[in-house]
Amino acid sequence: MKIHDILFGSKQKSILKTIEEGNLDELKIFLKNVGDVNEKYDNKSLLHLAIDNCQNNYFGVIELLINNGADINSYQSYLKETPLHRICARAKPKIDVVGLLLDRGAKVNAEDISSKTPVFHCSFNYSVELLNLLVKYGADIKHTDKYNNTLLHDDYLNCNTETFEDFVKVLISLGFNINSKNNEGHTPLYLCQNKDIEDILIKYDGKIS
């Protein structure tokens, strides 16, 4: 991509392509000449775009944006998700980048439109490493969303059973109640649609009601 295209082309298309490619040189030119690193593109900040779309130089791109003033706690306007929400929702979260965001001041208990905090998004991966890192920075594992769901009230349809069991064991060791009920009086086991996960919840004294 030519410098002229970065600066004067279709802004949304050009910067998104630069971020997708992880082209640090082009991104530096963009940041130097365009100005507002926190301008929104399709309701997403550049930091949100990088977390969701960057294919190369992942850590470097995100660090560069932060070093140039990207708002670590900015919201997507429609879901109110912060960058930390988005990276925790990755199937394979980048732990080094999660640590970077937390070190630079990301709010570990920021709430999205449903009052879910980033730790809720561990349900996309059930990473014990991610859970422990969030807890280290003060994540409240007992937090509930606006429907009183806990982070275990989920359908588990795509859940890895081995990862899930390790995740549950850590939660229990931290004092988490796997039989918490939401506003409809349902426990995680009641909502579970995955037989293997049901067996794990029952193994750790999960109750239907």
Regions found by a protein language model. Give the residues of each.
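Intrinsically disordered, low-complexity regulatory segments in ankyrin-centric signaling systems
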Residues: 1-33, 38-55, 59, 63, ...
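Ankyrin-repeat-protein effector appendages
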Residues: 1-14, 137, 167, 174, ...
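Ankyrin-repeat boundary/"N-cap" motif
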Residues: 8-15, 39-52, 75-88, 111-117, ...
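Ankyrin repeat A-helix N-terminal signature
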Residues: 17-22, 49-58, 86-94, 121-127, ...
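Ankyrin repeat domain, specifically the short helix-to-loop turn at the C-terminus of the second helix
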Residues: 28-36, 63-71, 99-107, 132-140, ...
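Alpha-solenoid repeat scaffolds
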Residues: 37, 53, 57, 72, ...
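Eukaryotic tandem repeat interaction scaffolds
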Residues: 111-147
